[in-house]
């Protein structure tokens, strides 16, 4: 049933897996942000909020990639071009978002332990290189396997 649904509506497994992978990453990288010492309720709320935002960014990147390549099944097809675009879109947004939120709106701050390049955290950039590729690999191997 899941496999059939994932073929008809590939956004569902993309969104679910994106949220789960990003939530894990957000909690693991939490010590690299200045608010890490705050109370548990705050950390849960903010990290899950970020994971939800990350999932929406991935869904947007999936949608744009699907429009450009005229197929919502590009994950199953395993072509390299759509996957590279998918990752590049998320990475481009992340670069802008990290810069804007740490330099302009001051929505969050890095701890001194966060490695940075030009004021942008390297760990969030690594997140947007690793997670979309991992998501694509998992969905190709698991969700789209023929029954």
Where are these regions (language model features)?
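Aromatic-rich, lipid-facing transmembrane alpha helices and their immediate juxtamembrane interface loops
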Residues: 1-147
């Amino acid at each position: 049933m899941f496999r059939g649904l994932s073929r008809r509506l590939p956004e569902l497994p993309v969104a679910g897996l994106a949220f789960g992978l990003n939530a894990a990453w957000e909690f693991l990288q939490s010590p690299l942000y200045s608010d890490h010492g705050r109370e548990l309720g705050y950390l849960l709320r903010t990290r899950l909020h970020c994971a939800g935002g990350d999932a929406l960014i991935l869904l947007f990147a999936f949608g744009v990639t699907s429009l450009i390549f005229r197929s919502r099944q590009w994950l199953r097809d395993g072509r390299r071009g759509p996957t590279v675009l998918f990752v590049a879109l998320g990475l481009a947004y992340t670069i802008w978002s990290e810069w804007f939120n740490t330099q302009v709106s001051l929505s969050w701050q890095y701890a001194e332990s966060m490695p940075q390049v030009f004021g942008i955290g390297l760990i969030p950039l690594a997140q947007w290189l690793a997670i979309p590729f991992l998501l694509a690999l998992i969905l190709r191997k698991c969700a789209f396997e023929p029954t």
